[in-house]
Amino acid sequence: MEETPQHCLSRLPDNSALKQQELPAHRLYFTARRVLFVFFTTGIFCLCMGIILILSARSTQEIEINYTRICANCAKLRENASNFDKECTCSIPFYLSGKMMGNVYMYYKLYGFYQNLYRYVRSRSNRQLVGKDVKAVEDCAPFKMSDNKTPIVPCGAIANSMFNDTIILSHNINSSVQIKVPMLKSGLTWWTDKYVKFQNPSSKNLADEFRGTTKPPNWPKPIYDLDKKDPRNNGFLNDDFIVWMRAAAFPTFKKLYGRLNRTHHFIEGLPAGNYSFNITYNFPVTRFQGEKSVVLSTLTWCGGNSLFLGLAYTVTGAITWLASFTMMAIHITLKNKQMSFFHQ
């Protein structure tokens, strides 16, 4: 018998289960019963989740007021870009029939505004927004430089078109007494946006840091002077600015504008009664046949008054169940045919 050379034996793998590929293995074996069980279970789960989410969304309190036509004079004024420096205000009274308990949030809602256009979304400078280089405007066409070649901060189309209506909610106790409802302008953003994606330059004096730059054409004041009441809410860390810069996926969307400061008269929420929205109308929507609304809403554990997620679960569950019954019918039919074949 011919012996194996010593140098060949040295190359042989160890006689272990791992190296000899003898580890125990499990091969999935899909039977009709197992597949049907998985489909039925998934369908039941999705249907139950969908019903729970829909009922939860229905339990929120929400009031929406479209003020595009109510403030028609202001809308017409804003159609002409040359009137941008002319102030226009309107007051919208409304009645809140029931108390809005707990935390109440104010949103602005836009119709027909396509924030998801590729060139629009890409027209921004992330290097600028994280405070690394405030004069980095390479990706911001067509809003990179002003007419006198000064860098625009914040640059880009999405920043230039920021929503700039001022909305004040007032509680009308009677014909002579009106209380301004306190709204907080902080805590409106996602944590990752506030502390990762947006940062101010290292200098504490933002005016000095932004020297040599100019504001976007549609902005009334520069980025470092957006909030006179709260110095921390200025620069790239301004909550309204961060909320606007998160582009919406659909042409109809709402964005958080403020949240109720539950103090004094509003500790439990918004009491029922007469209210009014006092709006400084700046953001033009009639140019693109759009509309805008202001929304007051409460939240539940799964969010606001949105049926999208609940309907998605319900439709998925219904389709899964339909597929389950179809597969079960096919399985029974084939099984009966097979049995009749053997009985022949």
Curated annotation (Swiss-Prot):
GO cellular component terms attached to this protein's record: endoplasmic reticulum; Golgi apparatus; plasma membrane
Annotated glycan sites: N66, N261
What InterPro entries does this protein map onto?
CDC50/LEM3_fam (IPR005045)
Q: What keywords are assigned to this protein?
A: Glycoprotein, Membrane, Transmembrane, Transmembrane helix
Annotated membrane topology is:
Multi-pass membrane protein
Q: Where are the transmembrane segments?
A: 35-55, 307-327
- The segments annotated as topological domain Extracellular are 56-306
Name the source organism: Macaca fascicularis
An individual GO BP term: phospholipid translocation
In which tissues is this gene expressed?
Specifically expressed in testis.
Its subcellular locations are: Membrane
UniProt name for this protein: Cell cycle control protein 50C
Q: Show which residues sit on the Cytoplasmic side of the membrane.
A: 1-34, 328-344
User: Which family is it part of?
Assistant: Belongs to the CDC50/LEM3 family.
